[in-house]
C-alpha cells in the first residue's frame, strides 16, 4: 500500500495492543521522519520516539498507547504548517505498515527536554486493537463543493488534490480549511477562530493546514503532478474578514497531460 492509498483508508486509532514494534521497524520509522520533506525544508525540526513508560504525558484527551512520537521545531514563520505537513506524512507511512496512530493535540510532556525548540505535536502509535481501516463512506467530512470556490477551469488535477485534502484529519474534526481553485493554482485558507481561545485554536488550524497540504503533496508525488508551494504577495497583502491565507499550490501545465 502507498501513502496515497492510505489517505482514503486511514482512521485515528484510540485503542492499542501492548505489542512491541521491532527495533528494525522503529529505526525505519525514525528514518522516515528524518527524511520527510515539508513545505519549508529549511526549518530545523527534531523527532523523538519513546515508549509510554519512558515519559509522562499531561493534558486533555490523551490516548493510552505503547509508543509516542514527538515533533519539535524551531519557532519561525510557517513552523506549525510545516510540522503538520511532516507529521501527517509519518502517520500515513505508519498506516502502510499496519501501525495505527492518533494525534494528541492536548498533550504535553511533563518534562520537556528541548529548551531551544517548541514541542509542536505528540502522536500516539502502535499496533491497533480496533479496526485499522475505514471505508471511504465512513469519512465524516464536509462536501467538496462547500469547501471550494472555483474560478475558471477545474480539471482532474484540481479534483484529485482537493479530494485528498478534504479527507485530512483535523483537531476535533473542525475541518478549518477552505480553498479557491483556478486553472493553474489552488489557494488554501483557514477559518479565523472565535475570540475564546483564539491563539490555541489558531495554532491548531495552522497545524491542520499543514496536514491538508501534506495530503495534496503526497497525491502530487503519487500521481506525478508538478506542483510548487508558495505564499503569494498579491494575496498576503489582502485582509480577509473570516479567513487566514495559508499559501498556494502552483500547478504546472504538464500535470494535466499525465
Task: Annotate each PLM feature.
Residues 1-258:
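Acidic, surface-exposed loops and disordered segments
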